[in-house]
């Protein structure tokens, strides 16, 4: 299935007419394709399956809680760079042993919280 497609000169996203979507939402808004997200996850996991890696999604790329929950359902981890992102990953249900705390300039509070939650690693 194509994500974007014209049918009878009308743009469709996931086979839904864009005009219909626009009638249901105020603009501007973000529109995500859950089908495409799942397809991307499957492709990435398939590409690396022989190595059995922990694939961590960088929460700074998109912190939408619904998307993060979908990542959790697909057994992905999280790469976080702040206390807020760490709390969001945990709120999404991502297991602490699948959370990597990257970035520089971590506060004592952030480090203590990460240790208390027993996350996988804290990178300096």
Regions found by a protein language model. Give the residues of each.
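A charged N-terminal "starter" segment
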Residues: 1-121
């Amino acid at each position: 299935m194509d994500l974007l497609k014209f049918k009878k000169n009308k743009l469709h996203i996931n086979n839904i007419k864009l005009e219909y979507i626009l009638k249901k939402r105020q603009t501007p808004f973000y529109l995500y394709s859950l089908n495409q997200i799942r397809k991307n996850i499957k492709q990435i996991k398939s590409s690396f399956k022989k190595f059995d890696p922990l694939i961590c999604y960088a929460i700074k790329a998109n912190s939408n809680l619904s998307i993060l929950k979908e990542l959790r359902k697909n057994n992905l981890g999280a790469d976080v760079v702040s206390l807020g992102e760490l709390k969001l990953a945990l709120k999404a249900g991502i297991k602490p042993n699948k959370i990597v705390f990257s970035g520089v300039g971590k506060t004592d509070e952030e480090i203590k919280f990460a240790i208390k939650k027993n996350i996988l690693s804290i990178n300096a």
